């Protein structure tokens, strides 16, 4: 399996090991510093079965040009960078897209209460 990690510098700023992912097969970590265009994303994802990203937006043309892609994981709580149309198209193509829906929920609640206490 080939896994491409886009936004590698955000997902792993240097304190996490990629070794676990390397055990899954071929790993390509792309440390893009700016928003890549569709052609660049397509080039990076060629031959990949899985992709991981944080904030890079993906459009339909990317999925159309990457027929082997079957799984996309977003290291975020939402799907903001993917349009509803893209999510429907991915479902039609059998591409699984997942996120981390409960990431940071306790920390956000704790922070909100700390801010409320600061007002007292």
Indicate where each model-derived feature is located.
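N-terminal glycine-/charge-rich "phosphate-binding" loop or analogous flexible N-terminal tail
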Residues: 1-48
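Phosphate/diphosphate ligand-binding glycine-rich loop within oxidoreductases
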Residues: 49-120
């Amino acid at each position: 399996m080939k896994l491409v990690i886009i936004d590698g510098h955000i997902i792993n700023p240097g304190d996490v090991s990629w070794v676990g992912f390397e055990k899954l097969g071929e790993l390509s970590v792309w440390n893009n510093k700016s928003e890549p265009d569709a052609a660049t994303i397509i080039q990076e994802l060629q031959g990949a079965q899985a992709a991981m990203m944080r904030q890079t937006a993906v459009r339909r043309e990317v999925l159309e040009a990457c027929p082997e892609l079957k799984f996309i994981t977003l290291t975020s709580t939402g799907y903001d960078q993917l349009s509803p149309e893209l999510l429907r198209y991915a479902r039609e193509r059998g591409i699984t897209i997942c996120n981390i829906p409960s990431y940071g929920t306790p920390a956000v609640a704790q922070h909100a209460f700390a801010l409320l206490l600061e007002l007292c």
